[in-house]
UniProtKB/Swiss-Prot annotation:
Gene3D superfamilies: Urease, beta subunit. This is Urease subunit beta. InterPro entries: Urease_beta-like, Urease_betasu_sf, Urease_subunit. GO terms for molecular function: urease activity. Heterotrimer of UreA (gamma), UreB (beta) and UreC (alpha) subunits. Three heterotrimers associate to form the active enzyme. Belongs to the urease beta subunit family. It is an enzyme of class 3 (hydrolase). The lineage of its organism: Bacteria, Pseudomonadati, Pseudomonadota, Betaproteobacteria, Burkholderiales. It catalyses: urea + 2 H2O + H(+) = hydrogencarbonate + 2 NH4(+). Keywords: Cytoplasm, Hydrolase.
Length: 101
């Protein structure tokens, strides 16, 4: 076994099963690429990304842990978000929440 290794059964595994999801259209209005990691509170991403921020409060990208989505300048794409789990409290990032959702 390798430290941090996760051993799973064979077959496919559904990520975030049973959790609420929503899709949002996101546009990078800036002149630089913006990359957002898998566990970043999407409500607080770079202000150059234009989307319905209120709808993103309490959600993150619905992608595998340790991965990211990159938004090129001028690019518009639809992303799927998944609700945050656990205590549903957000601290850090841009400091826009700093407590329970």
């Amino acid at each position: 076994m390798i430290p941090g290794e996760i051993l799973t059964d064979d077959g496919e595994h559904e990520l975030n099963a049973g959790r609420a999801t929503r899709s949002l259209v996101v546009a990078n209005t800036g002149d630089r690429p913006v990359q957002v990691g898998s566990h970043y509170h999407f409500f607080e991403v770079n202000d150059a990304l234009s989307f319905d921020r209120a709808a993103a409060r309490g959600f993150r990208l619905n992608i595998a842990a340790g991965t990211a989505v990159r938004f090129e300048p001028g690019q518009t794409r639809t992303v799927e978000l998944v609700e945050l789990a656990g205590d549903r409290a957000v601290y850090g990032f841009q400091g826009k929440v700093m407590g329970p959702l």
